[in-house]
Amino acid sequence: MALAEPSRLTKPLPGGREGATVVLHPMLCAYMYSPPEFMAMTGGRLKVVRQVLFARKQQIKIPIVAFLVEHPVVGPMIIDTGFHPSVATDPKQNLGRLYAALYNIEMQPDQAISAQLRERKGIEPSDVRVAIMTHLHMDHASAISEFTSATYVLGAGEWRAFHGARPKLNGYVRHHVEHAVEYKEVPYDSPVIDSYSTFGRAYDLFGDGSVRLVATPGHTHGHQSVILRLKDREALVTGDAIYFTRTLDDERRGWAMADEHKWHRSIGEIRLYRRENPDALIIPGHDPEAWATLLPKYE
């Protein structure tokens, strides 16, 4: 299926309201078992391969997550999609044989974000009009087909990386994005981009300061993180810019890495943000310890 290139954002999306704050709902979509070296390398790539092939009992259980964000005018939006509901019963149908064989996934059908939105909030997938994608790896983009009314907002370079050579070896599954949805790209190299806090490249998505997208490339070429304005503080959803909170201190990179130099720069910006905003809620991509401390709702 041939898809049109994403259009570049040149102005904020409609719905902004001066002084608006948002409500954040973290949502656990599944657990996936991963070799420790895949998430935080202490040796070379050969050590990772050995753990994948021969040390499955040593694997760690990591959360697969997505987020509901409620804006007073825009309404419900999501950050990432988590796994498609079918992954709960037949992973290879959505993820393909390679990833279904590589990863042991624990998921119930009612953990899919579409099911959780209905159960927890009475929100139908068609009510979600904006979906912010930190990146398009399979554990973040598997359920794009569930939210076909949404405009999907990608970081600059992610679409090109997704459609590059050997997508599956780089964490992408082509059919995850092959749906008749609108894709838009944040042009982090254009004059509409500003800086914000400790981040050199930021985009005010609705023009009201409630949702800011910040470029955090490295894990993927087009990776972005999300800063949300709550009533009394900010929340930073890092995506996979950092897998664990401790990554900010030990700087142990994961296996999946598009540009290590840019990754170090990105985590440097996040580390400085943490120091300058000690009250901010910082949510890493796959940290079981951090996830265990999260509340169901942040206002």
Locate each region found by the language model.
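Core dinuclear metal-dependent hydrolase active-site scaffold
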Residues: 23-26, 36-40, 59, 65-71, ...
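Active-site metal-binding loops of divalent metal-dependent hydrolases
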Residues: 29-30, 81-84, 136, 157-158, ...
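Active-site metal-binding motif and surrounding structural segment of the metallo-beta-lactamase
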Residues: 64, 92-154
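Cap/insert and terminal regions of metallo-dependent hydrolase folds
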Residues: 85, 90-95, 100-115, 221-299
